[in-house]
Amino acid sequence: MSVHPDLHQHYVWACQSTGQPENPLIACVLQEADKNHITRWTKGVTLKIAGNNHLVPVQRVTDDDFQVLASVLHNAVFVTGLDLRCNVLTDAGAKHMATFLQDNSALRYLNLMFNDIGTSGAELIAGALHRNETLLHLRMTGNKIGNKGGMFFASMLQMNSTLEKLDLGDCDMGPQCLIAIATALTHNKSIKAINLNRPLLYSHEEETTVHVSLMLKTNSSLVELHLGKHDMKNFGVEQLCEALYKNSSLRYLDLSCNKITCDGVKFLGELLKQNQALEILDLSANCIEDAGAIYLSEALALYNRTLRALSIVSSNIKGKGLVALSGAMKTNTELSHIYIWGNKFDEATCMAFSELIQMGRLKPDCTDVEPYEVDGHVHLAELSHGLQKHYYWTPSCEVVMSKDANASLAIAAVSEY
């Protein structure tokens, strides 16, 4: 089967033998994989059985559907990725997935985002990863595993030495498991990227940020860290910055959708004057205002030559701050990507960024604005570009190759790409 893959035929036989009706979505994807196997299977193939795919018949994958599929893929060593996002897998399906992960020695990428997996399902999947030595990238985004489910993944991180990317964003985790995960990462040497976006926090003391900061002081393997929607304030940013003076590995820091003001950005500006590791900084949807933008522009113009991408989308910045950042780009040639939409553009801002684009200093693919002229006045229109435009969805009509739009510039690509 690994030499001459015929996934669809095996799926038909498996459905007939178990009495399970064929799922049209699975059948369509397997037929397409069989058709393309000559050029693709030797490098490994990712089966994209996403329940939000509008170009093929969509009957979302159930627990019973996946049980049959798992039996088909048991010996398919050329299948190295499995995308099951936006289906209806529950804890029962997670049990089948755990068995599959224990027996499978080929899968490197698994996307389970936005299914219906809960705490017991998280326990089973995390338990399977205690022994799995193949999987590199796991996305659990949007499954409501809760604080207890997150604790099982924290325990897994103490045992697993293979997993490189773990996405636990929007999983309703609480402060206890965030602290446990941060503690586990003080010893885990394999995780390169972790997403902890949107936990459920009930305290204003920012204990979780303090523990993440302590972890960053000792962790030398983490490259990408997402702390969006953490209700983080200036105190939390100060703690992170103190840790990052001693950290030389983190290259992508996501602090979007927090409560950071210009005073917090001042700490980041001072950090950028000395830090020689950060390449991507996401400050979208904070309230950094002109003063914060000026702090950043001073650091970028005079000191920092490492940062390559900056997002300040919807950060309540006006013309003075935006013009200052455009001026920094004229002297800092390393900063190649900047995203500014959602701020308050005046004519000076429009002129400044139009000039950067026309002179070739800022490439159209590296920003989210495009200049146009009406009655002799320059304006800026929005472009669909950004650091994580395709975090929750992937366009069905095209293959998105740009790392700038999908994730990090810096982290090494794994099986998802």
Q: What residue spans do the PLM features occupy?
A:
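Leucine-rich tandem repeat or coiled-coil scaffolds
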Residues: 1-417
